[in-house]
Structure formats: structure tokens, C-alpha cells
UniProtKB/Swiss-Prot annotation:
SUPFAM superfamilies: PRTase-like (SSF53271)
Alphabetically ordered keywords of this record: Cytoplasm, Glycosyltransferase, Purine salvage, Transferase
Gene name in the database record: xpt
Name of this protein: Xanthine phosphoribosyltransferase
Species of provenance: Pseudomonas savastanoi pv. phaseolicola (strain 1448A / Race 6)
An example Gene Ontology CC term for this record: cytoplasm
Length: 189
């Protein structure tokens, strides 16, 4: 997606050969026009997938997920990282390790929002080692639902997440595939 590539080139900051900072438009400050384009593109890519719900993890996946949900006409559910007083039932949950935050947390979704009839699209801001995606897949399976595919805004192809998801037979559509961050330069695949 050229608009996303341009934004990454112009406003992304390479912090190391493993970390790309995109807080100017995706995961701190949000560019609504770009999010609309991202949502439109995910809706186009998964138009034939029979999606009934979209699932993401709070917080950075919410904006692209909502835009895709708006375009596709389906609800968006975000897995919570922190339990709320309003979440009192037995939750669907999984443990996830965050590469950038270097912390493990439990993410959860109320079972009232997913059923075995659902065909779920996972949307997330980044795909690195695939741990967040695997946690969401686990939650979806706990509900008896099926995974329609994964929509990733930025994939760090040099980390192993994509290969693992491909090996498991999941459809993965990434809008920007970063091949390398070596030398402080973003190289797209």
C-alpha cells in the first residue's frame, strides 16, 4: 500500500535493526485519513472471506480494526490487556509476549461476543514474532469460531511471525512488508 509505505518512509523512525517507531501516525498519534485508507484496503482484501467479526488487541490495533469494521459492516472486538470490573464472566483468554514492551500479559475477550458461528478477521498494527496473532487465534478457537485471516498493517518480515502463520495455513495480508531495518533504513519487501 503506497500511502502507508510513504508514511513509514517519511515519519517512521528506525530505533534499531529490530524496532520501527510509527507513533506519529499509527500507535500514539493517529492519522485518520490513513486509517480510513487502511480500513478500505483490508475490506477490499477480505471481501470474499465471509467475515462476521473483527478481533484485535488493545490499543494500537483498534483504529485500523474499527475502520475495517465500518467498511465491512461488522462488529469489532478488542482483546483487553487489563481486566475491568465489567468483565465478570469466564473469559476467553491467552498469554501474549510483547516484543517492543518486553512484557508478558494476558489478553481476554468476553465469550458473549464470539460464537461458533463467527468467521473472524484478526487485525493488528504489527506482525513481528507472531505472539499477539497466536494469542488471538487461541481465543477465537476457544470460542469455537474460525479464523478468516489476518490483516496486518506493518509486517517485520525478518522476524518469524509470518512464516509460522503461513505454516499453520492462515491467510495473512500485510499492507507493508518490511524486509530490513539495517543501518537505520527501512527496506520494503
Amino acid at each position: 500500500m503506497e500511502a502507508l509505505h510513504k508514511k513509514i518512509r517519511e515519519e517512521g523512525i528506525v530505533l534499531s535493526d529490530q524496532v520501527l517507531k510509527v507513533d506519529a501516525f499509527l500507535n500514539h498519534q493517529i492519522d485518520p485519513a490513513l486509517m480510513k485508507e487502511i480500513g478500505d484496503e483490508f475490506a477490499r482484501l477480505f471481501a470474499d472471506a465471509g467475515v462476521t467479526k473483527i478481533v484485535t488487541i488493545e490499543a494500537s490495533g483498534i483504529a485500523p480494526a474499527v475502520m475495517a469494521g465500518l467498511n465491512m459492516g461488522v462488529p469489532v472486538i478488542f482483546a483487553r490487556k487489563h481486566q475491568s470490573l465489567t468483565l465478570t464472566e469466564n473469559l476467553l483468554s491467552a498469554t501474549v509476549y510483547s516484543f517492543t514492551k518486553q512484557v508478558e500479559s494476558t489478553v481476554a475477550i468476553s465469550p458473549r461476543h464470539l460464537s461458533s458461528d463467527d468467521h473472524v478477521l484478526i487485525i493488528d498494527d504489527f506482525l513481528a514474532n507472531g505472539k499477539a496473532s497466536q494469542a488471538l487465534i487461541s481465543i477465537i478457537k476457544q470460542a469455537g469460531a474460525t479464523v478468516a485471516g489476518l490483516g496486518i498493517v506493518i509486517e517485520k518480515s525478518f522476524q518469524g511471525g509470518r512464516a509460522e502463520l503461513d505454516a499453520q495455513g492462515y491467510r495473512v495480508e500485510s499492507l507493508a512488508r518490511v524486509e530490513s531495518l539495517a543501518g537505520g533504513v527501512v527496506t520494503f519487501k
